[in-house]
Amino acid sequence: GNGIVYRNRISDGFSGKLYTVNKEGGLSEVVPLPEGGFCSYSSDGKQLAYNRVMREFRTWKYYKGGMADDIWVYNPEKKSVENITNNEAQDIFPMWIGDEIYFLSDRDYTMNLFVYNTKTKQISKVTNFTEYDVKFPSSFGNTIVFENGGYIYKMDAASKKPEKVNVTLASDNVYARSEIKDGSKYITSASLSPKGERMVVTARGEVFNIPVDKGVTKNITRTPGAHERDAQWSPDGKHIAYISDATGETELYLQDSEGGEPTQLTKNNDTYIRTFQWSPDSKKIVYTDRKNRINLLDVSNKQLTTISQSLLGEARNVSFSPDNNWLTYSRVSDNNFSIVYVYDIAGKKEYPVTDKWYESYSPVFSTDGKYLVFTSARDFNPTYSQTEWNHVYNNMGGVYLALLSKDTASPFMETDAEVAIESTPAKADASKKDETKNEASTPVVKIDIEGITDRIVKLPLPGSNYYDLYSDGTNVYYFTKGGMKMFDLKKQKEETVSDAAMMVDPAGKKAVFFKDDQLFVTDIPKGKANLSKPVNLANMKITVDYTKEWAQIFDEAWRAFRDGFYLENMHGKDWKAIKEKYAALLPYVKTRLDLNYIIGEMIGELGVGHAYVNPGEVESPKRVSMGLLGAEVSRDKSGFFRLEKILPGASWSKELRSPLTEPGVEAKAGEYIVAIDGVPTNSVNDMYKLLIGKANVPTE
C-alpha cells in the first residue's frame, strides 16, 4: 500500500509503459513489461493484472481488431505472463479482489462487468445492462463503483449485486452559466454590401450587420440555440441571406437589410447545405448540399430546381457569370480528377471546360465576362529526391484563363503598334444615356463551347498552390505562398497585395481582408493594400447560452454523421433511436467535456474507428514544462544520482539534441549529478524536482 502504479510514454512516443513510485515520492521504477495500460495488483502485491493497450478514452465501440485488449497476468517471480481472457472483444479495467479479477467486456455487445476466478479459471458475467455501457469502474477493498447511463453504482464483490448510489452535488455550475463573448474572436465569414458601407459578418453562429466606418453594430439573429453561417449581402443591397439550422435542418433564410423578421426560403430540407451564392441580379441563389446536388432557387417565388447531382462527389466553387446566364463549378470525374464545367441555365446543359487528365478547380468568371479563371495542376516540373532514386511531382498548380469567346485574343499575344488618330466624338443621345450605362455595367457573356479546351492560357507564374481567385478582366488576384497577389494582364507583372486573403464586394468596388482577428476594407487594390485602419469590431458581443448551444452542437454532430457517413444504412444501426438514447442525457450536461463525452458515446455506436470529437472550448490548466536529460538515472546509496545510460542525440538539431551530449558538456555514463543550479541532489528524493520549469532553460 505504499506504492503508486501509473502509465507513461516517456520512453516511447507510441506505446506506454507502467511505472511504480513510492507514495512519498522518489525516482520511479519501470515495470519490466513491453507495454501497459489499466492494471491492478493482487492483494499480496506479487502479481499484476493489466491491459497492454489503453484506448478507453477514444470513441471506439464493438472493436475486434488488433488493438482489442485482453487481460494479462504478470508474475515477476516466474517472469511469466498469461492471457486470462483470450477473447476477440474488448476486455479492460482489471480489478483484482481476493481470488477474483473483475473486468469490463463488450463480448455480449453492451459493455458489462465480468469476473475471472483465479482458482477455477472460469469467467462469468456479473452485470446485465443493455442500454448504456458500464464505464470507468474502480475498486477499493471489496467494493466496485462504476458509471452507467449517467448514474453511479456500487457493488459488493461478495453479493455481486449493483446498487444505484444517490449522489447530490452542491454546484453553481459555473461552466454552464450564460456569458458575453467577444464575437470578433469567432469570425467565420464576412460579406460587404454592394458599395462597401457596411458588412455582414458571421461569428459563433450569429449574424452581425456592421458599419465599415461609423454606425451601429447589430446582431440580426440572436439565436443561441441555432447555428447561422455564411451570411451574404445581395448584390442589389436589399437583402441578407444566410444558412441556419433553427428548424433542426439547415435551411436558407432571407432578411431585409434594414431589419425585420427573416423569411425561410427553403423548407423540409433533407441534408446539409454546404455553400451558396447570389446571382448578380439578386434574383436567384445557387447552393450545394451533402447529396452532391446543385440547386437553383428563385428568391421571389421560392421555386427550387435541382440542376445537377453527382454520385462521384460534390460540386465546388459554384458561382454565376456576370450576366446571370451561366454557372461554373468544378467536380470530380470518373478518374477522380476534378474538371471545370460551365452550365447553361436556359439550355439546362453543362459543358466541360477542362479535360479529365489534369486536376482543375476553383473556377470564377472575370467580371468583364471574357475569361474563366481557374487553377489547375498541369505544371510538370519534377524535383529529384536527394535521399532516394525517385522524382517528386509537387508544386504543379498554376492559374489559367479559358478564353470564353473564340473572338477573344490571348492577353499574352504580342500586338503591332498602331498610330493613334485623334477624332471628335459624336454627341451622345441623352435619351439613350441610361440604357448605354446599364448595358455597359452588365456584360453579355458569350461562350463558344467548341474548342474551348484549346483556348486555355497560363499566367506566367511558378508552380504552387493558388486559392481565392478574382478577376476584373484586367487584373487577376490569387492567394498563394506569401499572401494575396495580383497579376496585371496588360503589364504582365505580378504585384504583392497583402499577406491576408481578400474578398470582393458584389459591385466589384471594395475588398475586405481578414488578418489577426481584424477586418480591413479598402478599394480593390492595384498594388500593395493599405491595411492601416481596421473595422471597429468592438461591439460584436454575443450572449452565449451554453445549455442551448450544447444542444445545437449535439444535434449538428448527429446530422453530420447522418449526412456524411460512408454507408447510408449507418452500419445497420437505428441512428434516430441512438440520437434519442443519448439526447436523454443532455439535461445533465454542465460542461463542454460532458457534451464531448456524450457525443463520443453516440458516434461510437456506429462501430467505426477514427471518428473523434473536436474538444471545442474546454477549461484546461497551463502545463508546467519539465526539463529532461535524455538519460536513465538511478539513485546511489550516497543519495546522489548516477547516470546509467545517456541517449545519443543530434547536436545540430533543436528537436533531436540530447542535453548531456551537447558540445562542451562531456557527461559520461557512470558519472554522478551532485547538484542542479547549486542545490545538492542528495537533499531531494527525486532530482527531477529540481528540473521543473527548466525545459529549454540553461541549467548547471
Which residues fall in each region the model found?
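Blade-terminus and WD-like Trp-Asp/Gly-His loop motifs, strongest in beta-propeller folds
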Residues: 1-3, 39-47, 93-100, 136-141, ...
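A flexible loop/linker signature enriched in serine peptidases of the S9 family
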Residues: 1-23, 27-39, 43-72, 76-92, ...
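Conserved PDZ fold ligand-binding element
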Residues: 657, 661-685
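PDZ/PDZ-like peptide-tail recognition elements
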Residues: 609-655
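Terminal targeting/pro-maturation regions of precursor/exported proteins
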Residues: 533-612, 639-641, 652
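A short helix->beta-strand "capping" segment at the edge of beta-propeller domains
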Residues: 171-187, 445-462
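PDZ-domain C-terminal substructure recognizer with occasional recognition of PDZ-binding tails
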Residues: 260, 688-700
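Conserved blade-ending motifs and adjacent loop-strand segments that build the rim/top face
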Residues: 124-138, 351-362, 460-467, 495-504
